[in-house]
UniProtKB/Swiss-Prot annotation:
Pathway info: Glycolipid biosynthesis; lipid IV(A) biosynthesis; lipid IV(A) from (3R)-3-hydroxytetradecanoyl-[acyl-carrier-protein] and UDP-N-acetyl-alpha-D-glucosamine: step 2/6
GO molecular function: metal ion binding; UDP-3-O-acyl-N-acetylglucosamine deacetylase activity
Name of the gene encoding the protein in the UniProt record: lpxC
Domain of life: Bacteria
Catalytic activity: a UDP-3-O-[(3R)-3-hydroxyacyl]-N-acetyl-alpha-D-glucosamine + H2O = a UDP-3-O-[(3R)-3-hydroxyacyl]-alpha-D-glucosamine + acetate
Full protein name: UDP-3-O-acyl-N-acetylglucosamine deacetylase
């Protein structure tokens, strides 16, 4: 299986979740073995910021990267879509400190990638194959990666709320690009009205609205159109996890499972994997393998 980039650049304008301002985002093809990199176009001589778990400095509400004091935030939804398509090399130019929130899912990014087209490159794609179980725990929350022939995610959340029935709080996802687009990529982020009001009083989540999130009050869902999936809440957590795990810098061959995990714990898990070289190996695979077929467009 070969490395992938885009066939052509593509640009979109969207709202920054926290700033509430318009953000211009350009996805630009990049050479083999350059990886996923971000560039702030609003700052002169800004450094390139790699999509790297070890550059994550802040995980409050999103995954945020920083180099030399220059920050790029809310990267997980875009990275999730890139992981879904197996994009290895891309230069992401952004006109502000955060990636636009779009509709709160990765669906708009899926559309952008399909419009730009996927280019196979003249170098083998590399995967991180998990060799041993690795688990991180914080209180009652945990996240784990273990050996698995493919890529799967099993996630459980725990909310005591009438709008999030208990029988919709766990979801198991067997990765393929088609499965991603149909079942996870369009699951929106969610939040509680009381929290959003508090954040906006502190000049955060200024771009948050019913257009880019599922919002719950004390009684239920405020969005008139309802949910896209019965388990949209936990499916979005899987979307987030796929993006957070892509900060490992490789597509994964392994099984991910989690209970009440979030950006901080997902990041801690990747760092823990790297902590012992015996936890993983970097491999290439044949186009005919089941892992490669999962990325067929």
């Amino acid at each position: 299986m070969k490395q992938r980039t885009l066939k052509q650049p593509i640009t979109v304008v969207g709202i920054g979740l926290h700033s509430g301002q318009d953000v211009t985002l350009t996805l630009q093809p990049s050479e083999v073995n350059t990886g996923i990199r971000f560039l702030r176009t609003d700052i002169e001589d800004a450094p390139l910021i790699a999509a790297d778990a070890f550059l994550v400095t802040d995980t409050v509400m999103s995954s945020n990267l920083m180099v030399n004091g220059i920050k790029i935030g809310t990267v997980e939804h875009l990275l999730s879509a890139l992981a879904g398509f197996g994009i290895d090399n891309l230069l992401i130019k952004v006109s502000d400190a955060e990636i636009p929130i779009m509709d709160g899912s990765a669906a708009n990014y899926v559309t952008l990638l399909l419009e730009a087209g996927i280019e196979e490159q003249a170098a083998p794609k590399q995967f991180m194959k998990i060799l041993k179980p690795v688990k991180v725990v914080e209180g009652d929350k945990w996240a784990q990666l273990e050996p698995y022939d493919g890529f799967s995610l099993d996630f459980e959340i725990d909310f005591n709320h009438p709008g999030i029935p208990k029988d919709t709080q766990r979801y198991r996802f067997e990765f393929s690009l088609h499965n991603y687009i149909e079942n996870v990529g369009n699951a929106r982020t969610f939040g509680f009205m009381r929290d959003i009001e508090h954040l906006q009083k502190n000049n955060l989540a200024l771009g948050g609205s019913l257009d880019n999130a599922i919002v719950l009050d004390d009684n239920g869902i405020m969005n008139k159109e309802g949910l896209r999936h019965q388990e949209e809440f936990v499916r979005h957590k899987i979307l987030d996890a796929i993006g957070d795990l892509y900060l490992a810098k490789y597509s994964l061959i392994g099984g991910f499972s989690a209970y009440k995990s979030g950006h901080a714990l997902n990041n801690k898990l990747i760092r823990e994997v790297y902590n012992d070289p015996n936890n993983f190996e970097i491999v290439t695979i044949y186009d005919t393998s089941s892992v490669a077929r999962a990325y067929e467009i």
